[in-house]
């Protein structure tokens, strides 16, 4: 749980059941959720908290963004999961168990790989929600995958600043530099390209597979989550290779991988002239 592997030996209780037999066990759920959250915050954040205690105003900008984003994603994801699945996969549980399962699924999507409900019976809206959470993932310097909470936060703030006609993107009285924004845009676009190419490849090789399940598998692999709707066993050798490559890209990091493949260029003082083009 801490390292976001998602492996378990609970198949001896229920084949491919993960933690579904413990959906109502508060101790198991809270323990696993705590390990997932601790591992997903990142060592930079924990170092900052250790040095400055619980004084939020003194934290680094990254620590503030990570904590705020983590809380929002967990609570928001849990509320939406509950609303979507209350009369579906959660219908057999009590009210308290529904809330517990909703929070667990919201936490585990970023990016642990355990589940306490049957993922194969989720509604399309819930699957999309989980894909979003898997895509965002954890935080930089952690054991989690995804584009990271800081990347999503920077992009969101930058888009808001653009829509409100502000010249700069600011958060907690700090300004994001252009290099940070460029990196965030690059990470988002590179991951989107990985998803698009992988989807085309899998649909071409195995067109009989449901679209929802294929995309779920892709997001889960790229986010190094490990949750599956059950189609992994149906994948051909080539399809599995695609999934393996996605997991590798997700673990190494899309931007790191792209930079490692690019050639080093000499820094030049000469710049091309600027010319504006229409956007949107």
What is the role of each PLM region?
Residues 1-280:
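Membrane-proximal intracellular helices of multi-pass ion channels
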């Amino acid at each position: 749980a801490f390292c976001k592997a998602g492996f378990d030996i609970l198949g001896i209780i229920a084949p491919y059941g993960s933690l579904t037999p413990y959906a109502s066990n508060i101790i198991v759920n809270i323990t696993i959720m705590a390990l997932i959250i601790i591992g997903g915050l990142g060592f930079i954040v924990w170092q900052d908290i250790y040095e400055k205690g619980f004084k939020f105003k003194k934290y680094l900008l990254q620590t503030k963004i990570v904590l705020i984003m983590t809380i929002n994603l967990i609570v928001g994801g849990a509320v939406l999961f509950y609303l979507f699945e209350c009369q579906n996969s959660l219908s057999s549980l009590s009210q308290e168990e529904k809330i517990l399962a909703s929070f667990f699924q919201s936490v585990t999507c970023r990016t642990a790989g355990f589940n306490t409900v049957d993922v194969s019976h989720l509604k399309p809206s819930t699957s999309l929600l989980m894909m979003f959470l898997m895509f965002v993932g954890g935080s930089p310097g952690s054991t989690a995958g995804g584009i990271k909470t800081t990347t999503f936060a920077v992009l969101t703030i930058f888009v808001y600043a653009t829509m409100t006609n502000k010249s700069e993107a600011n958060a907690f009285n700090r300004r994001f530099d252009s290099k940070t924004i460029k990196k965030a845009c690059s990470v988002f676009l590179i991951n989107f390209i990985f998803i698009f190419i992988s989807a085309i490849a899998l649909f071409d090789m195995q067109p009989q597979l449901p679209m929802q399940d294929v995309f779920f598998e892709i997001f889960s692999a790229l986010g190094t989550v490990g949750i599956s709707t059950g189609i992994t066993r149906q994948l051909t050798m080539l399809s599995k290779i695609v999934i393996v490559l996605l997991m590798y890209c997700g673990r190494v990091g899309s931007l790191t991988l792209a930079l490692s493949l690019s050639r080093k260029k000499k820094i030049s003082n000469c710049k091309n002239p600027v010319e504006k083009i229409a956007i949107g």
